Amino acid sequence: MNIQDMILTLQKHWSSQGCVLMQAYDVEKGAGTMSPYTFLRSIGPEPWKVAYVEPSRRPADGRYGENPNRLYQHHQFQVIIKPSPDNIQELYLDSLRALGIDPLEHDIRFVEDNWENPSLGCAGLGWEVWLDGMEITQFTYFQQVGGLECKPVSVEITYGIERLASYIQDKENVFDLEWTSGFTVKDLFMMAEYEHSVYTFETSDVDMLFQLFSTYEKEAIKQMDNGLVHPAYDYVLKCSHTFNLLDAKGAISVTERTGYIARVRNLARKVAKTYYEEREKLGFPMLKGEGSSHE
């Protein structure tokens, strides 16, 4: 099964469980969890079901396209359901069956791996899912998002698309994976992998990136003061990505690193609080099954 068919299969499976199929969010981020479809929607009491593919950029993992297992940008298939259903593990195993992986014929283990994202003030109880010795999925019950306690608890399922495809297609090099008929990962992403690695490690302007971080930080605070959650959160994401670029370049010392992470976390917490307050003003409309002109 190629990657495109894998994605279509997962979309069909989770759509049948009532998930909204969203498209990837158009601001750089290091993980699918950082999308507003997860970060913001996990806050507050309103129910939510979503599934989407998220390209995830991790500048420090760039290897000029020369490493068979490390990528500047990989893809995650993200599922969020709030409140978490009692049969979520069985629904997940059903998704593996849909991909042609029979749990009865494979060694599938849920290995405890509690999760934390310090820069977003997020934490949860969770497991890595191992398939015949390879991690393919992260399974997390959110306890805290943006420093706020999660009531009710959301469950997040994150499939590593390239990793799962490596198993399904029995390929050792990620660039050899078939994306769809006639196209490999190498065809689609090798040039970008190489160029982003050159940019990250060689040609990026450190002074400009430091300036951008401060500019994005100020704008995030300004828009929160205006009660505009989504524009503010976009700038939090931009702060996070800019920090990751600086960190990958080695421009931030160990001592400074803690301070920068704290600055991003403080922004994320303010956004979370503002989002909750704005939804509360609207009367948490999705509790009533109503839409909102502010969506």
Swiss-Prot record:
Pfam families: tRNA-synt_2e. Its main location: cytoplasm. Keywords: Aminoacyl-tRNA synthetase, ATP-binding, Cytoplasm, Ligase, Nucleotide-binding, Protein biosynthesis. One of its GO terms (cellular component) is cytoplasm. The keyword Ligase applies. It catalyses: tRNA(Gly) + glycine + ATP = glycyl-tRNA(Gly) + AMP + diphosphate. GO terms for molecular function: ATP binding; catalytic activity, acting on a protein; glycine-tRNA ligase activity; transferase activity. Tetramer of two alpha and two beta subunits. Belongs to the class-II aminoacyl-tRNA synthetase family. This is Glycine--tRNA ligase alpha subunit. It comes from Bacillus subtilis (strain 168).
